[in-house]
Regions:
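Sec-dependent signal peptide recognition
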Residues: 1-7
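Cell-envelope and extracellular/periplasmic
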Residues: 17-406
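Hydrophobic h-region of N-terminal signal peptides that target proteins for export
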Residues: 7-15
């Protein structure tokens, strides 16, 4: 009897499992042209999943963990909205509507990448695009922020792929980049945005790339101290719990005497952080890999402005990690050099130091890398780091892409 109930519950659990798609696969998505297109998600183990799009029919079987992946053959660019159908052998299906094929770029960084078009010099562009009688095929998806110690499979996006009617809420730098590409290429342009304000570069970097870079031992140790699956992590947590036990006794005695308790011991490494090395890569980049893209654009540096030359090592690890994770060893990577900031002061160089290090990185890593100078576009602003002119820097970045990739 018990065995029968258990089997019934198990079958019910399998039956209740629904076919799911990875976060970038929503209505109105843009797929990368001229490349194999990975499609993946989850379902009950053993389920057969079929994808139908643009005359292709591809199938895959969910593994023991319920994960499945297939690849569409390279697609031609198309301005025609079509249905992307996903179904399984249990009668479940998803029809994604309004799907286009064109160019897709991954976009990341901190607050100046997050900054919306409606609050920048791109606002007129955004207004014109949102009110255009004929819709311009520029779309953006923004991946929600999750911090994690290990790479995650799933992510979320509040709105999925947004059409250009909502351009005022797009990333300003990404919108101007996409618009410049569209003007020249006349194909749909998609922006896969995974950025977060006030965040250091190492948070967006793949763990293996940090571990393998000889100049990033401090970042590596922060990760290993927090990972109980490593010997270093086990020792760090043993020490933490010993310190915590001692602290509890000291704090208790202090409280009994009416005194002030000392500060509680910190968790080891990045365990007590949420924007530490690799945490945003794990939580909000890994889940969208290997969505097919042409390349990546990057705007960041404020939170690392005191790094000195180690920032060049961190940029090297960022690029190598992304290229490795996507399986694109020649992935194009274009970035903005830091803007001017602060009033002229011999005691305060503003961002001059990190601009120099960004230039050093660029000179030593020229393969499919481009740097956009913007110090002539955004003058020093003592009042804030969020510069207004986000129109022209990304137009310059688009020129890198148009010259090198098209």
């Amino acid at each position: 009897m018990i065995r029968a109930v258990f089997l019934a519950l198990a079958c019910s659990s399998v039956g209740a499992k629904e076919i799911q798609l990875a976060a970038p696969f929503t209505d109105n998505m843009i797929l990368q042209r001229e490349r194999a297109v990975p499609v993946w998600g989850s379902d009950a183990p053993g389920s057969e999943v079929t994808v139908e799009f643009a005359g292709q029919v591809k199938a895959a079987k969910a593994d023991d963990k319920g994960d499945w992946m297939l690849r569409l053959d390279p697609l031609e660019a198309s301005l025609t909205e079509r249905v992307f159908r996903v179904r399984n052998n249990r009668g479940q299906s998803h029809d994604l509507k309004g799907v286009l094929v064109g160019e897709v770029w991954f976009s990341s960084g901190q607050s100046n990448m997050v900054w919306t078009a409606g609050k920048s010099m791109c606002r007129d562009l955004a207004s014109d695009l949102s009110r255009a009688e004929k819709e311009v095929p520029i779309r953006e998806i923004n991946i929600n922020t999750v911090s994690a110690l290990y790479p995650q499979k799933k992510a979320t996006s509040e709105q999925g792929w947004k059409k250009v009617k909502e351009a005022g809420g797009f990333s300003a730098l990404s919108l101007s980049f996409a618009h410049e590409l569209y003007r020249e290429l006349q194909v749909p342009i998609g922006i896969l945005l995974s950025a977060h304000s006030n965040t250091r570069i190492e948070a967006f970097t793949q763990r293996q790339a940090i571990e393998s870079h000889p100049g990033l031992s401090d970042d590596k140790n922060l990760i290993h101290d927090a990972d109980p699956l490593t010997e270093q992590g086990r020792r760090a947590f043993e020490q933490y719990y010993a310190d915590l036990e001692a602290w509890q006794e000291i704090a208790g005695n202090a409280a009994e005497r009416g005194g002030k308790a000392p500060g509680r011991p910190n968790l080891p490494g990045i365990a007590g952080m949420w924007r530490g090395p690799s945490q945003f890569f794990n939580g909000k980049i890994a889940p969208v890999i290997p969505y097919a893209i042409r390349g990546a654009i990057w705007c960041q540096g404020t939170s690392n402005s005191g790094d000195g030359r180690v920032y060049a090592s961190r940029m090297e690890a960022l690029v190598r990690g992304w290229r490795d994770a996507w399986g694109m060893p020649e992935m194009p990577f274009y970035f903005t050099q830091m803007q001017c900031y602060g009033s002229p002061d011999p005691e305060n160089v503003g961002f001059a130091d990190i601009r120099q290090v960004q230039h050093l990185f660029f000179m030593n890593n020229r393969e499919n890398v481009g740097m956009v100078v913007q110090s002539d576009l955004n003058s020093a602003n003592p009042g804030g780091i969020h510069y207004f002119n986000k129109l022209h820097p990304r137009m310059r970045m688009a020129r890198w892409a148009l010259a090198k990739d098209y």
